[in-house]
Amino acid sequence: MEQKMTNNHITIGILAHVDAGKTTLSEAMLYSTGQIRSLGRVDHQDAYLDNDAQERERGITIFSKQARLDISCGTNAADTARTADVARTADTARTWHVVMLDTPGHVDFSAEMERTLQVLDYAILVISATDGVQGHTRTLWRLLKHYNVPTFIFVNKMDMQGTDAEKVQAELRSELSDGCVDFSSQDLFEELAMCSEPLLDEFMESGEL
């Protein structure tokens, strides 16, 4: 697939099987980047992107939606939220302009979801730690591979009782790809830190990247 990313503008899509927590993640991203002032919830029928009456009544995403996030490099999420207005006028070399596409998770609306894949630079595939890899998850993975979309896997609900990070990681490797790596592991941080001096400085200071 031809690379669509230009300069500091990227398009990402959020995909998931139903009830994986995709809308919750979208709300958190919008809130942490200062695009919304309060977190909406599906069960409260006030999620920012699920603004269609049918979506709010049924508690699912039916239509693909988009939102723009301005993310300033070198700041954490809290700083970005507090300085959202400044970020919009900051030096563009230090700000990523992200178009986020929220897609339907229900299998009945797969055609609506698939239409977005051809315009993505990256995808975030949300998986519930309590449900694991579902049939629809495998379908999404195959489609992302077909359209050659680089994909980050976000494992949601890891704070739920009975979840096991090692078990989830093993399932991702066996069901999706043995190339799935845990970006929170200490070994990975150490390996990445050796790739550049700024990363090494950050790792030595905070122990994370």
PLM regions with names:
Residues 1-20, 39, 75, 93-95, ...:
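P-loop NTPase catalytic nucleotide-binding module
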Residues 81-86:
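Intrinsically disordered, low-complexity tandem-repeat regions enriched in Proline and Serine
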Residues 2-79, 91-127, 133, 174-176, ...:
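P-loop NTPase switch module centered on the Walker A-proximal segment
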